[in-house]
Curated annotation (Swiss-Prot):
Its EC number is 2.7.7.59, 3.1.4.-. Transmembrane segments: none annotated. Pfam families: ACT (PF01842), GlnD_UR_UTase (PF08335), HD (PF01966), NTP_transf_2 (PF01909). Keywords: Hydrolase, Magnesium, Multifunctional enzyme, Nucleotidyltransferase, Repeat, Transferase. The gene is glnD. GO terms for molecular function: [protein-PII] uridylyltransferase activity; phosphoric diester hydrolase activity. This is Bifunctional uridylyltransferase/uridylyl-removing enzyme. The lineage of its organism: Bacteria, Pseudomonadati, Pseudomonadota, Gammaproteobacteria, Pseudomonadales. Residues 706-784, 816-892 form the ACT domain. Residues 461-583 form the HD domain. GO terms for biological process: regulation of nitrogen utilization. It catalyses: [protein-PII]-L-tyrosine + UTP = [protein-PII]-uridylyl-L-tyrosine + diphosphate; [protein-PII]-uridylyl-L-tyrosine + H2O = [protein-PII]-L-tyrosine + UMP + H(+).
Length: 900
């Protein structure tokens, strides 16, 4: 800390200003304001961050000393003002907690009560937000013995004013000789760290990470230093290196990583104007600019900044693992430790952990850097890697070069890992953690820490990739197979499961490079297969899966699966059942590893339907596509059988069906046709709108709630319906609109609740939905008001111009309107209003929400049920949608251009 810094705080000038004023408050406030301006200016000019946070602590020391002097403490008074916690370390960010201990010799506080209260009031009046406690030395001991946080804070202390002897006595009575021996302290701190990591999802890669508390954050460094202080009396990184827990390169990396996070935290506090440790979207762009990250636009500068952030916290996490493991081996070492058990000539088992048998293992036999992970996968009883061996891996990973990558011993070992029955994900994660995976596969190293700046992808590309492999592995667990029955069944029967793991490893590896990441990844995957000498069939399957890993989800969510041509086209891409099985399992795991909230019961049922229909098409043969007329006949025959058995007159059924048209029977199953027809035939002529509600499947984790509406057609039918559903808090995922020749509309909607689940067996909720829709459709002139909900904070930071593409379908007389837009409350209701304004009829719709954006497809016609043909009308329609759906973006974020 500086001894003198008159620009930051001039003691003489401050004392003079105090003497001129009746009240000291104005002088203190002025000094605090000026100091903040000086320090912020120094930060913006690039001043050393360590010096900055120490300077701020020095300034606060001076202010507190001057405030303390305002009261009558005798020189030999048994009371001291002590800084504890982060402030006790001499580190203060702009709005960090200023933790104070007013330390007394005696538990009798009365003699000082009035002065203490007036002192704390003064601090409040001058704008210092402090956390304070008033304790005697004995009370400190009592509190510290019972509370891990208290003992931790007291370990980091400095006397600001008053006699130093009180603090020394406090340190003595709270030393390891009296409480919290280093073993107990270590176990408690390790448990505390695990709980904290779990709070932040056990990942460094949260979209809005906490720079202090998230894994790899500042608190992990502090945990290391706290344990070291309790064990060795050491409280800085350099001293820790001196104890042999860090080599010089690790010390330098940890110090530079800490300084980077200090810069981020300082900028966060400065921009937020308050204590803020969450790296919110609100601040990411400003901090990226403040710290000098540049890109083609705001989005790429944010992604560059966040990639640097993630790589820094990954480094901290790696070193934290190493040092905590080192502490465990030293502090928890049993007195009667068993001798190490040899595994082979290179490795041995030491207290349950694998370790190199000598320091030259990796230098003399570099292939052992892959072998160690294969051994752990083959012997799952191994708890992990000894600290010294982790360090040896880090020190020797530079030996992984092109010669290493092409060595058949290494390529064979890497493939062997993927053939292991268990431990694939765990050991790939270790390889990534220790920096081995990115060295062995440079293309993987490129995606480490790479964040895509959206709400759809909630993990970095490398974390998502490893999560996908984890999900593939979990499909073998009973509790997971219940939620993903088909995927689990198929995973168990894949002829070579290692191939889907390898395809998963490469499916997104092309991201971050210009071009189609599927095509780029396929090229990388092919090179990998050649280098690892995989058989031709295996290689072709892996490359095909990488190249086509998105096609199944895209088809299921954006195409009409009731259309035989859609199934035929998809089957033509897949070509055989083996590819279909692999692709289905990969798709399910990809969606769940991208963002768990994306997986819902309706997506599950769509993928199952596409899988089942495609399997039938492949078994039938692509040269024998489904005949539309034959499909209609089969549907009608099966439905008629159900209806007749239910007591319906076949003639009445035939008369109703003659009005419905072919599309109706192509889009609905025989069971649904029978359900609809039976209800329509029972409906009185003047009974008003008919609203039917049921679940689409009996499978627990699949399907949605189907709402069928039969009513006289009216111009505003779709607009009224979706507005009413919006008011009922229903999310529409599929819409099928049929108009009969008798001018009745038969609309089917698949809906989920706001949690992404079907309505289920909830009679009260079903009754409310039915009554709400019936009332809205009975009185369409009372057009339901679109609910004005606030656009969520996060969505505002991913605003982009809605993209609208309008084209005519070559196979059907409809116009296809494809919409990609920022999600917002009431979006479909707004679209319905626009269709009403432009006199358009909706024939079908596919609805998909992907994070912060929706990707919807609407099949529409004009008032004469014809495709749109007027270019000017299309242009005005596009403009209206863009204007209605644009979410106000953050300043400086450019909107994406409209594409026609």
């Amino acid at each position: 800390m500086p001894q003198v810094d008159p620009e930051l705080f001039d003691r003489g000038q401050f004392q003079a200003e105090l003497a001129l004023k009746a009240s000291p408050i104005a002088a203190f406030k002025k000094a605090i304001r000026q100091a903040r301006e000086v320090l912020d200016g120094r930060f913006r000019s690039g001043r050393d961050i360590r010096r900055l946070i120490e300077d701020r602590a020095w300034f606060v020391d001076n202010i507190l000393q001057k405030a303390w002097e305002q009261f009558s403490w005798s020189e030999d008074a048994d009371i001291a003002l002590v800084a504890v916690g982060g402030y006790g370390r001499g580190e203060l960010h702009p709005y960090s907690d200023i933790d104070l201990l007013i330390l007394l010799d005696s538990a009798d506080h009365e003699i000082f009560r009035d002065s203490i209260e007036r002192f704390l009031t003064l601090l409040w009046d001058i704008g210092l937000e402090v956390g304070q406690s008033v304790r005697s030395v004995d009370e400190c001991a009592e509190e510290a013995r019972a509370d891990l946080t208290v003992i931790t804070n007291l370990m980091e202390s400095r006397t600001i004013a008053g006699p130093e002897r009180l603090r020394q006595r406090m340190l003595e009575v709270t030393s390891t000789a009296h409480m919290w021996p280093s073993k107990d302290f270590f176990l408690a701190k390790r448990a505390e760290q695990k709980a904290r990591h779990h709070k932040y999802n056990d990942t460094e890669y949260n979209l809005e990470p906490n720079v202090k508390g998230s894994p790899g954050g500042l608190r992990d460094i502090q945990t290391i230093l706290w344990v070291a202080r309790r064990q060795y009396g050491t409280l800085n990184l350099r001293a820790l290196a001196g104890e042999g827990f860090l080599v010089e390169s690790e010390n330098a990396l940890l110090a530079s990583s800490q300084e980077f996070l200090w810069k981020v935290r300082y900028a966060l506090h400065m921009l937020a104007g308050r204590s803020e440790d969450r790296l919110l979207f609100d601040h990411q762009r400003s901090i990226a600019t403040l710290l000098g990250f540049e890109g083609e636009d705001a989005k790429t500068s944010i992604e560059s900044f966040m990639q640097q952030y993630y790589r820094v916290v990954m480094s901290i996490a790696q070193l934290s693992d190493l040092i905590i493991q080192h502490f465990e081996e030293v502090i928890l070492a049993p007195e009667d430790e068993a001798p190490p058990q040899p595994i082979n000539s290179r490795f041995q088992l030491h207290d349950g952990y694998i370790e190199a048998r000598n320091d030259n293992v990796f230098r003399r036999t570099p292939f052992a850097m892959l072998e160690i992970f294969v051994l752990m996968a083959q012997q799952p009883e191994i708890k992990g890697v000894r600290a010294d061996t982790i360090r040896l891996l880090r020190e020797n990973r530079h030996l992984i070069d092109d010669d290493f990558r092409n060595d058949i011993r290494n390529t064979s070992l890497f493939i062997e890992l993927f053939k292991c029955k268990i431990g694939i994900h765990r050991n790939l994660r270790r390889m990534n953690r220790y920096g081995i995976l990115g060295r062995y596969l440079p293309e993987f190293g490129f995606i480490v820490g790479q964040m895509q700046h959206d709400l759809f992808h909630i993990y970095t590309v490398d974390a998502h990739t490893l999560n996908l492999i984890k999900h593939l592995r979990k499909l073998q667990y009973t509790q997971v197979s219940e939620k993903f029955p088909l995927a689990s069944k198929l995973m168990a029967k894949l002829p070579k499961p290692e191939l889907i793991y390898l395809a998963g490893l490469y499916h997104d590896i092309g991201k971050g490079r210009h071009g189609d990441h599927s095509e780029i990844g396929a090229v990388d995957a092919e090179a990998f297969c050649q280098r690892h000498q995989l058989p031709l069939w295996d290689s072709r399957l892996i490359v095909w899966l990488v190249q086509n890993h998105l096609v199944m989800s895209t088809t299921a969510q954006r195409k009409d699966l009731s259309d035989p041509q859609v199934i035929h086209d998809f089957a033509g891409i897949v070509e055989d059942e083996t590819r279909l099985d692999y692709l289905y399992v990969l798709t399910v795991s990809d969606i769940n590893a991208t963002n768990p909230t994306l997986w819902n019961s309706w997506r599950a049922s769509l993928l199952r339907q596409l899988y089942t229909e495609t399997k039938r098409a492949l078994r039938r043969g692509l040269e024998n596509p489904v005949d539309r007329e034959e499909q209609i006949r089969r549907t009608q025959s099966a439905a008629l059988d159900i209806l007749v058995r239910g007591g319906n007159d076949p003639d009445d059924v035939e008369q109703l069906w003659s009005q419905l048209g072919d599309d109706y029977f192509l889009r609905h199953t025989a069971g649904d046709v029978a359900w609809h027809s039976d209800a329509i035939l029972q409906q009185p002529a003047d009974g008003g709108p008919l609203v039917l509600i049921k679940e689409t499947t009996q499978r627990e984790f699949e399907g949605g709630t189907q709402i069928f509406i039969y009513a006289p057609d009216q111009h505003d039918f779709f607009a009224v319906t979706v507005a009413a559903m919006d008011q009922l808090n229903l999310n529409i995922h599929d819409a099928r609109v049929i108009t009969s020749s008798s001018q009745f509309t038969l609309d089917t909607y698949i809906v989920l609740d706001t949690e992404g689940e079907s309505i289920g067996d909830n009679p009260v909720r079903v009754k409310k939905i039915r009554e709400g829709l019936t009332e809205a459709l009975r009185n369409p002139d009372d057009y339901p008001t679109i609910i004005q909900r606030r656009v969520p904070r996060q969505l505002k930071h991913f605003a982009f111009a809605p993209q609208v593409t309008i084209s005519n379908d070559a196979q059907r007389p409809v116009t296809v309107l494809e919409l990609s837009a920022p999600d917002r409350p009431g979006l479909l209701a707004r679209i319905g209003g626009i269709f009403l304004e432009f006199d358009l009829s909706l024939q079908n719709a596919k609805i998909a929400t992907l994070g912060e954006r929706v990707e919807d497809v609407f099949f529409i016609t004009d008032a004469d049920n014809q495709p749109l043909s007027d270019p000017e009308l299309c242009r005005r329609l596009q403009d209206a949608i863009v204007q209605q759906l644009s979410v106000t973006q953050e300043p400086g974020v450019e909107l994406t251009r409209l594409t026609i």
